[in-house]
Every structure is written in C-alpha cells, then in structure tokens.
Amino acid sequence: MATDLNYIKYVVEQIDLPDISFKKMFGDYMVYYKAVPVLLVCDDCVFVKILKETSELLGEDCEQGFPYDGAKLHYVLDIDNSDLARQTVVAVYNCRKDKPNK
C-alpha cells in the first residue's frame, strides 16, 4: 500500500519548519529538510534512521520497524507529537548535512 498524498501533507504540517519538502519515490515519500533527506514515509507511517542522535531523542523503547522489504531497521516516529517530530528532523539534519549523498 502506498502513502496517501493527504498523509504526507499532514506530516509536513506537523513538522512545521521552513525548507521542508517531499518527493515521491516508488509510491512512498522521502521528506527533506534544507535538501537533506531526513524521514521516510511508507504506507502512511513515518520512519527515521536509527542514529545516536535519534536514539537520544526517541529513547530505546521507541517503536521500530522496517519501511520496506530489505531495509534496515528504523524508528517509527510519532508524527502526532509535532514538537518531537520537529526536534527529530533537526537532529537528523544536523548529523547528515555534511555527509555526501551516495
């Protein structure tokens, strides 16, 4: 099942930061902050990479899942908690902004 366009718009509204964009990829979406990929939205569920910074914010008890077959394990972000979602996006951006794209 692909992500609904209304859901990705809701995700962007919840994050409520300037320079947020999204791009459709294989029926699902990648969310970018200042052109840096920060979130993956698959099947109307928001996934964030497991990093030291995201572990500190979300905690070890955060729900985890696989966004698609063959993917690495990710945290499942509670997008209804807009403050936490915003902090998570900024944290991922700060640790990824200087890394070159593959």
Predicted feature locations:
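Charge-dense, helix-prone N-terminal extensions
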Residues: 1-102
